[in-house]
């Protein structure tokens, strides 16, 4: 009887010791959730690689965040390795602002960016996920299932940490476990001192190229697409296309659009950006705001058409 009692006491002590150890040594994923709730600022830099229109794009990313008096401030700067085009997106008390080289002013959006979708360079996007944790030889891997409109072919992701719990790599995968996107983390700091003036977008920055003439944009390099009608209205140009799909483009010069644009999502392009509002998908590039209308096109197909827009001269046959 005494032996049984001793064993019971040992088991209780063992279970209690394990519980106490876990309580004093929380898992990495629990630490990240706590950090997400308590951090007041961060600085993050890295290199983003992804396949875009059958070409590998490499983008240098600088991402900063600050919380002050209950207000969240975000700053993201993207620079394309190939074109050296720079785009900046800022969230402050006034709203969301996008500035892209080639435009002489920032654009303001009514948007919940960046909280409305996953961003591999926004720490709150990563730290808030429901992870499973796996220990490896040189650190840990955190895995999570994600379903995002921004990355429709992505089904899951992994975040690699070294043995000191320093984040090194964020990878997104499709259902065939093929890597779709990766973000190599170069540096990041939690709770650094950041000047709030950083989150005020300066529209007086030097612009690399200014348009001297606004020309219509046409979807180039698309197979089985034919322009069937072109109508000039007082403020806009309406272009109707037929082919494998029917769609209409409405193009409006930038000086004719509202100063504040409502958007649920913003996608930065090499030479402009795309935004979504109430199922409408629009593109701002080359001095034009173009909205696409179609009943049988998927979101990805609309994006593909808008990213193919270029200035051209249409010659009637």
Segments predicted by a language model, with ranges:
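N-terminal leader/targeting segments and the immediate start of mature chains
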Residues: 2-72, 130, 134-135, 265, ...
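Gly/Pro-enriched, hydrophobic low-complexity segments
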Residues: 77, 137-205
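Flexible, processing/modification-adjacent segments and terminal tails
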Residues: 20-28, 90-155, 194, 206
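An acidic-aromatic
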Residues: 65-118, 174-184, 274, 283
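One face of beta-strands
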Residues: 42-48, 59-65, 70-78, 87, ...
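Short, solvent-exposed recognition patches
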Residues: 202-286, 294
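Short solvent-exposed loop/turn micro-motifs enriched in small/polar/acidic residues
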Residues: 56-58, 81-83, 126-127, 151-154, ...
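Short beta-strand segments that buttress and anchor functional surface loops
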Residues: 46-50, 74-81, 142-149, 170-173, ...
């Amino acid at each position: 009887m005494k032996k049984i009692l001793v064993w019971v006491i040992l088991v209780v002590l063992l279970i209690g010791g394990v519980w106490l150890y876990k309580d004093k040594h929380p898992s990495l994923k629990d630490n990240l959730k706590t950090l997400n709730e308590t951090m007041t600022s961060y600085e993050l830099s890295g290199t983003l690689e992804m396949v875009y229109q059958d070409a590998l794009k490499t983008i240098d990313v600088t991402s900063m965040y600050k919380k002050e008096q209950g207000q969240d401030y975000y700053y993201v700067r993207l620079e394309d390795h190939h074109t050296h085009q720079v785009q900046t997106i800022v969230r402050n008390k006034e709203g969301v602002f996008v500035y892209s080289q080639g435009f002489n002013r920032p654009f303001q959006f009514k948007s919940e960016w960046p909280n409305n979708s996953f961003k591999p360079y926004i720490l709150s996007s990563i730290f808030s996920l429901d992870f499973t944790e796996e220990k490896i030889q040189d650190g840990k891997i955190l895995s999570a299932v994600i379903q995002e409109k921004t990355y429709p072919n992505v089904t899951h992701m992994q975040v690699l940490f070294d043995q000191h719990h320093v984040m090194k790599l964020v990878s997104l995968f499709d259902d065939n476990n093929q890597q779709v996107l990766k973000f190599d983390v170069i540096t990041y700091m939690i709770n650094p001192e950041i000047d709030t003036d950083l989150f005020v977008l300066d529209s007086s920055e030097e612009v690399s190229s200014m348009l001297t003439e606004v020309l219509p944009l046409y979807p180039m390099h698309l197979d089985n697409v034919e322009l069937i009608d072109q109508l000039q209205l007082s403020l806009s140009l309406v272009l109707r296309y037929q082919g494998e799909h029917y769609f209409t483009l409405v193009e409006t010069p930038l000086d004719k659009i509202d100063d504040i644009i409502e958007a649920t999502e913003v996608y930065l392009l090499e030479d402009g950006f795309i935004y979504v509002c109430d199922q409408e998908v629009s593109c701002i590039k080359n001095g034009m705001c173009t909205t696409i209308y179609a009943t049988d096109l998927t979101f990805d197909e609309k994006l593909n058409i808008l990213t193919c827009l270029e200035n051209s001269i249409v010659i009637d046959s």
